[in-house]
Regions:
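Conserved N-terminal helical subregion
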Residues: 22-27, 77, 85-88, 94-208, ...
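Conserved FAD-binding catalytic core of PHBH/FMO-like flavoproteins
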Residues: 166, 173-174, 180-319
Length: 492
């Protein structure tokens, strides 16, 4: 007992000294910009390692966003590893068991796969507990506030409400020493051996370190439905038709989020046609299940329409001494599959392992940190490449714009109808349960081959030779959908 008390005293003294350095000199082991999904997770993980952390956030008010409201099972598992799973409590979170895909009115239930001790899924499901995994859906703002409360409880983390405005650089080495900020209207500065930029999809610092920019070809427009009568409660709903996809999922006991994808320059959503409300009323409502229409129509009349760009940005290797970009500032994919938070939490888990004090005692050891970031860049791809590629490929199919893509869309739905591994594999990938890129490759081309077969045999007999020839175009379209995103992952 004496030994334990004696060893605890120096640690407590170090903790007090570190806090004094943060409070008086604004100096820490790590400065993190952005107390969002990734920033909170990373701050808490590093604080638990005994690192001294300053977390900057421009506003600690509860955010009001329309994305970041569905956490896949792989994200729930990562939250557990971070010791933050209790953040899903007391926010009226809804259990999510899978998806209900509705294709021109026909439904297929897609449940997350059972992870049994002796199953093939178990072999592919790295780190997922035995049993049937569950996701969670919730109000984004409530979840963020719970994450922030968790971080505030960590004695090694100081949360500061301030707006980061610029980076502090060493004049001789050009390495990053910290950030300049505005706090309570006054200029200030915060210094760390490592600066982590996690300021979200619209990062003000990203363009200083990357020449490329996020690619966005559509927006999600959002409504909040009250007491909607969903076809399959506790499931995400994906509605497919001759227009872009529609998502429906509960975010509370009484609230359901509706996300409507509207591509750029869509005629029915143009100002001349009456704008987005015209598109929602005259194009979207008729495509909804009849039981959902009353709540949807009421939301159109009641809600202020809000939107978010659907962006794609492949990750790049961090090479700047003293600074790393992470979260949406580093990597984004289409939010159709709800994979963003799962990627963020798993990145925090992996990075905390690579930054373990037993491996990197001091985070101002820039050579060691950059070496760890090279490892991080490639190790994360078992999960992130799968989620990134799947999100982009599924969006291309679900928002089919030509005959070949519509053939692939139909083939995808028929593939789901086969059940068994034809459901377990794809939804296991989407849920962050299966983390093997080859499994994605296998299922995608299984869908492509089924699509080609259906394209040939479901036409008129007299057109069989023509459709057989046209099937080549379907195959090449499948390659055109998938391979650019594979190359983007490899190139980055």
């Amino acid at each position: 007992m004496t030994t334990s008390t004696a060893s605890a005293a120096p640690r407590e003294a170090l903790s007090h000294e570190a806090k004094r350095m943060r409070d008086e000199y604004h100096s820490a082991d790590v400065v993190i910009v952005g107390a969002g999904i990734f920033g909170c997770a990373m701050a808490y993980a590093l604080g638990n390692q005994g690192r001294s952390v300053i977390l900057l956030e421009k506003s600690m008010k509860q955010p009001d966003r329309i994305v970041g409201e569905l956490l896949q099972p792989g994200g729930v598992e990562a939250l557990e590893k971070l010791g933050m799973r209790d953040c899903l409590e007391e926010i009226d979170a809804i259990k999510v068991f899978g998806y209900d895909v509705i294709y021109y009115g026909e439904e297929v239930k897609i449940s997350y796969p059972q992870v049994a001790g002796d199953s093939s899924i178990r072999e592919k499901a790295k780190g997922i507990e035995k049993g049937r995994p569950e996701g969670r859906s919730f109000h984004h703002g409530r979840f963020i506030q719970r994450l922030r409360q968790k971080v505030l409880s960590n004695p090694n983390v100081s949360v500061v409400e301030a707006t980061a405005t610029d980076l502090v650089r060493c004049e001789w080495t050009d390495q990053i020493l910290g950030v300049e900020a505005i706090r309570q209207g006054e200029p200030d500065a915060y210094f760390g051996g490592l600066t982590i930029i996690a300021d979200g999809y619209n990062s003000k610092f990203r363009k200083a370190f990357r020449t490329d920019a996020p690619i966005s070809k559509s927006k999600f427009w959002a409504l909040e439905l009250i007491d909607a009568d969903l076809p399959m409660p506790n499931h995400g709903h994906v509605l497919l038709s001759d227009s872009a996809p529609i998502l429906l999922y509960q975010i509370g006991t009484h609230e359901t989020r509706a996300l409507i994808d509207i591509p750029e320059n869509l005629p029915s959503a143009s100002l001349a046609a009456g704008g987005v409300k015209n598109h929602l009323t005259n194009v979207v409502v008729p495509k909804l299940p009849a039981r959902v229409r009353p709540a949807f129509t009421a939301a159109i009349a009641r809600d202020r329409l809000r939107s978010m760009p659907n962006s794609f940005l492949p990750a790049t290797t961090n090479k700047t001494p003293g600074l790393i970009l992470l979260g949406d500032a580093l990597n984004m994919r289409h939010p159709l599959t709800g994979g963003g938070m799962t990627v963020a939490f798993n990145d925090a888990v992996l990075l905390s392992e690579l930054f373990d004090p037993a491996v990197i005692p001091a985070l101002d050891d820039h050579a060691a940190v950059l070496s760890a970031m090279r490892t991080f860049h490639w190790r994360r791809k078992n999960l992130t490449a799968v989620i990134n590629i799947l999100a982009q490929a599924l969006y291309a199919l679900f928002a089919a714009e030509d005959a070949q893509l519509r053939a692939l869309q139909q083939g995808c739905f028929e593939y789901f109808k086969l059940g068994g591994n034809c459901i377990d594999g794809p939804v296991g990938l989407l849920g962050g349960i299966i983390r093997q890129p080859f499994v994605l490759f296998y299922h995608f081309f299984a869908v492509a081959l089924l699509s080609i077969w259906l394209y040939i045999v479901r036409g008129k007999t007299v057109l069989l030779p023509v459709r057989a020839l046209g099937s080549v175009g379907v195959f090449f379209k499948a390659c055109q959908v998938l391979f650019p995103y594979i190359f983007a992952e490899l190139r980055s």
